[in-house]
């Protein structure tokens, strides 16, 4: 892959609680300009993003029960269903972390319920690796596979740390290529982006997408 093609792996993200209409509008226009795979926005901005991106190939991604994952499964199903009706192409849902750590089968059932309403739309399950040990990351990966998720995602970006290369390696080894992997949170340089893709990340979530692409372009020109 040419380093300039990394744009197609990026979910260009703004999930700030105080994100303004102007910031989301700029996010969408940047995604069009740089050819990012999607924009990832809070549900309140789905319609805004969809309207701006309507004639472009850029997808609209949103979040469910973000960033804590602590609401009822029924509420997560409702949020996902409503988000898709509003125009979301992809759903990033936060799992119930304590139940995941406790090994509750309800986690798998919750993923299945949300995936059912997603249908052919993409479901990514956020497991917040900062709060898990290595064995729990392995179990989380298997739970996402059993629940029928399309992706397992490392982080919300709101916890004690974002993605690590070791997180991706563990997920890759545990999954045996049965699920895609999204790395998000804290990826701030082009070299980090390249390393995450090398170890197995299929998608990258970042708010620094434009900076990364500019760095990648410089690296490409320096060859």
Swiss-Prot record:
<dbReference type="InterPro" id="IPR002915">
    <property type="entry name" value="DeoC/FbaB/LacD_aldolase"/>
</dbReference>
<comment type="function">
    <text>Catalyzes a reversible aldol reaction between acetaldehyde and D-glyceraldehyde 3-phosphate to generate 2-deoxy-D-ribose 5-phosphate.</text>
</comment>
<dbReference type="InterPro" id="IPR013785">
    <property type="entry name" value="Aldolase_TIM"/>
</dbReference>
<dbReference type="GO" id="GO:0004139">
    <property type="term" value="F:deoxyribose-phosphate aldolase activity"/>
</dbReference>
<dbReference type="GO" id="GO:0005737">
    <property type="term" value="C:cytoplasm"/>
</dbReference>
<dbReference type="GO" id="GO:0006018">
    <property type="term" value="P:2-deoxyribose 1-phosphate catabolic process"/>
</dbReference>
<dbReference type="InterPro" id="IPR028581">
    <property type="entry name" value="DeoC_typeI"/>
</dbReference>
<dbReference type="GO" id="GO:0016052">
    <property type="term" value="P:carbohydrate catabolic process"/>
</dbReference>
<feature type="active site" description="Schiff-base intermediate with acetaldehyde">
    <location>
        <position position="153"/>
    </location>
</feature>
<dbReference type="GO" id="GO:0009264">
    <property type="term" value="P:deoxyribonucleotide catabolic process"/>
</dbReference>
<dbReference type="Pfam" id="PF01791">
    <property type="entry name" value="DeoC"/>
</dbReference>
<dbReference type="InterPro" id="IPR011343">
    <property type="entry name" value="DeoC"/>
</dbReference>
<keyword id="KW-0456">Lyase</keyword>
<feature type="active site" description="Proton donor/acceptor">
    <location>
        <position position="182"/>
    </location>
</feature>
<feature type="active site" description="Proton donor/acceptor">
    <location>
        <position position="92"/>
    </location>
</feature>
<comment type="similarity">
    <text>Belongs to the DeoC/FbaB aldolase family. DeoC type 1 subfamily.</text>
</comment>
<keyword id="KW-0704">Schiff base</keyword>
<keyword id="KW-0963">Cytoplasm</keyword>
<comment type="pathway">
    <text>Carbohydrate degradation; 2-deoxy-D-ribose 1-phosphate degradation; D-glyceraldehyde 3-phosphate and acetaldehyde from 2-deoxy-alpha-D-ribose 1-phosphate: step 2/2.</text>
</comment>
<protein>
    <recommendedName>
        <fullName>Deoxyribose-phosphate aldolase</fullName>
        <ecNumber>4.1.2.4</ecNumber>
    </recommendedName>
</protein>
């Amino acid at each position: 892959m040419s380093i300039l093609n990394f744009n197609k792996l990026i979910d260009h993200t703004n999930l700030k609680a105080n994100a303004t209409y102007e910031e989301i509008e700029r996010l969408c226009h940047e995604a069009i300009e740089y050819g990012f795979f999607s924009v990832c926005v809070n549900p309140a901005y789905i319609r805004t993003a969809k309207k701006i991106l309507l004639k472009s190939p850029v997808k609209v991604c949103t979040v469910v029960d973000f960033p804590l994952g602590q609401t009822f499964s029924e509420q997560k199903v409702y949020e996902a269903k409503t988000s898709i009706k509003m125009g979301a192409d992809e759903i990033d849902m936060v799992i119930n972390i304590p139940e995941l750590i406790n090994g509750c089968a309800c986690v798998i059932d919750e993923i299945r319920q949300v995936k059912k309403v997603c249908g052919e739309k993409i479901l990514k399950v956020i497991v917040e690796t900062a709060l898990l040990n290595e064995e729990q990351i392995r179990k989380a990966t298997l739970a996402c596979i059993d629940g029928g998720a399309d992706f397992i995602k490392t982080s919300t970006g709101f916890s004690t740390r974002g993605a690590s290369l070791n997180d991706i390696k563990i997920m890759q080894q545990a999954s045996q290529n049965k699920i895609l992997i999204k790395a998000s949170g804290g990826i701030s340089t082009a070299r980090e982006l390249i390393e995450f893709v090398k170890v197995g990340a299929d998608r990258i979530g970042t708010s620094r997408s434009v900076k990364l692409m500019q760095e990648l372009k410089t690296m490409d020109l320096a060859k």
